[in-house]
Design a protein with these regions (language model features):
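N-terminal glycine-/serine-/threonine-rich phosphate-binding loop
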Residues: 1-36
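Glycine-rich N-terminal segment of FAD-binding domains in flavoprotein oxidoreductases
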Residues: 32-55
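Glycine-rich beta-strand-to-loop/alpha-helix junction loops that act as flexible
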Residues: 38-43, 138-142, 194
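A glycine- and small-aliphatic-rich helix-loop capping segment at beta-alpha/alpha-beta transitions
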Residues: 49-60, 85, 151-160
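Ligand-binding beta-strand-loop-alpha-helix segment within the catalytic cores
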Residues: 60-134
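A short secondary-structure junction signal
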Residues: 115-116, 147-152, 201-205, 241
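Class I SAM-dependent methyltransferase SAM-binding "motif I" and its flanking Rossmann-like core
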Residues: 138-181
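ATP/nucleoside-binding phosphotransfer catalytic cores, i.e., glycine-rich phosphate-binding loops
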Residues: 187-241
């Protein structure tokens, strides 16, 4: 695990964007394509807007990039809270990404079927025995959740690399998420976290004793890949080391 701490949100985003470009181009050179699982939320939105801006959009052959979603809210794709819709507006439309390169969760299906079908689509994409994304982008919630791996949910104990539906009792809503074992098979995993509101969660996940029920992001530990954190000084404020 490597922790990269920067002075500001702007520096965090710029450095993660540069990292994204490097990983993407290396994968394209080696295999002819780049597979990335996107994260939802306000922080990743700023990253996607940066990647599709004039300073970055010419640095990757975007027609060789295949986009997936590490988690999704169980809402229509036209809903304002949809991770797909956010990525569509911030990334896909500005970069003119074709539908053949966008692998979204079909939220028109029943929730368990949506999760199952997404797992099947991912398995078909990866012809090798092991499902191994080139890059999985993750955020971190104030409650130490990542993707839709929330505290005290049964999916935390899944041991199979797959996609599952999760019911969040406090929100009375479903989400669909990669399991931790699926995330952990990736070649590269990157957390994007900034702001003092995330400082406690960063400390819990990185430095506290293992307690996945309360700090689910502790589950993220790539088995044969690289884990990097991109955080600002505010988010790192409670780290002891």
């Amino acid at each position: 695990m490597k922790i990269n701490i920067f002075n500001s949100e702007t520096e965090v985003l710029a450095n993660l964007a540069a990292y994204f470009v490097t990983i993407a181009n290396n994968a394209i050179v080696q295999t002819g394509k780049f597979s990335v699982a996107l994260s939802g939320g306000s922080s990743p939105k700023k990253l996607y807007e940066l990647l599709s801006s004039p300073s970055f959009k010419e640095k990757v052959d975007w027609h060789k990039v295949d986009f997936f979603f590490g988690d999704e809210r169980y809402v229509p794709q036209t809903d304002s809270s949809s991770n797909y819709l956010m990525a569509k507006k911030a990334l896909f439309e500005p970069l003119q990404i074709g539908p053949a390169h966008i692998f979204a969760v079909d939220t028109s299906l029943k929730v368990d079927n949506a999760a199952q079908q997404y797992a099947v689509a991912i398995t078909k994409y990866f012809t090798a025995d092991k499902i191994q994304f080139d890059l999985v982008l993750l955020g971190l919630g104030d409650n130490s959740h990542t993707a839709s791996l929330f505290p005290h949910t049964t999916v935390l104990h899944d041991t199979i690399p797959s996609v599952k539906a999760v019911y969040l009792e406090d929100q009375k809503k479903y989400r669909i998420t990669f399991t931790a074992p699926l995330i952990n098979q990736a070649h590269h995993v990157a957390f994007l976290v900034y702001g003092d509101a995330k400082a406690k969660a960063v400390h819990h996940v990185i430095e506290d004793k293992r307690d996945i029920e309360n700090f689910p992001a502790q589950l993220i530990a790539p088995s044969d890949g690289e884990l990097q954190w991109f955080i600002d000084k505010a988010a790192a404020a409670k780290l002891k080391q």
